[in-house]
């Protein structure tokens, strides 16, 4: 079984800035401070680009996790995809879409996450009862941090 969820965030900043900021290793690390997420291999600082890999180490549910992601799709400033190539999930695909807001006053960022938990039938139960909601909350927290930082960067300074 697999699960899919979508998170839509309006950010008052141009798509190019939102796109680039979304690929920042440092911003990702700061947004995931509660789980002590760190880049430990591959690209460990700066902006991720096409074909880049990064291995993240974190703690979720009190358990240490390692996940290596690949930037498998990249079309600046409209889209990128990260996929797990090694880690705790049977499958993890996270599509990031960026479009100019209808009022042209910002960017609509749409995250589409498709994942499958490990552990057979037990994983299916965990996926349905806990994991989907937990992961959506992580994306919401990350996006709130991204929104705050990006809007501060885009705001005119006197």
What annotation goes with each model-predicted range?
Residues 8-12, 57, 70, 97-99, ...:
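Generic structural detector for well-ordered beta-strands
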Residues 27-30, 93, 99, 141, ...:
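K/E-rich alpha-helical interaction surfaces of small helical-bundle regulatory domains
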Residues 25, 54-56, 129, 139:
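Short alpha-helical segments used as structural interaction elements across diverse proteins
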Residues 81-137, 157-158:
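Beta-strand/loop substructures that line and gate deep hydrophobic ligand-binding cavities in soluble
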Residues 1-44, 49:
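Hydrophobic ligand-binding cavity/cleft-lining segments
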Residues 4-6, 64-68, 91-95:
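Short, surface-exposed coil-to-beta transition loops
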Residues 39-86, 103, 108, 141-144, ...:
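Glycine-rich portal/gate segments that line the openings of hydrophobic small-molecule binding cavities
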């Amino acid at each position: 079984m697999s699960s899919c969820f979508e998170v839509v965030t309006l950010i008052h900043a141009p798509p190019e800035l939102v796109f680039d900021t979304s690929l920042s290793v440092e911003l990702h690390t700061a947004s995931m401070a509660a789980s002590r997420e760190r880049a430990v291999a591959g690209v460990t600082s700066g902006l991720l680009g096409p074909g880049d890999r990064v291995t993240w180490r974190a703690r979720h549910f009190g358990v240490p996790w390692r996940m290596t992601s690949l930037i498998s799709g990249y079309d600046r400033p409209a889209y990128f995809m990260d996929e797990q190539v090694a880690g705790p999930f049977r499958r993890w695909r996270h599509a990031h879409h960026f479009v100019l807001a209808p009022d042209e006053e910002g960017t609509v960022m749409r995250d589409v996450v498709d994942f499958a938990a490990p552990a057979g039938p037990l994983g299916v139960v965990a996926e349905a009862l806990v994991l989907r909601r937990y992961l959506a909350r992580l994306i919401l927290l990350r996006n709130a941090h991204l929104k705050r930082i990006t809007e501060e960067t885009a705001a005119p300074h006197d």
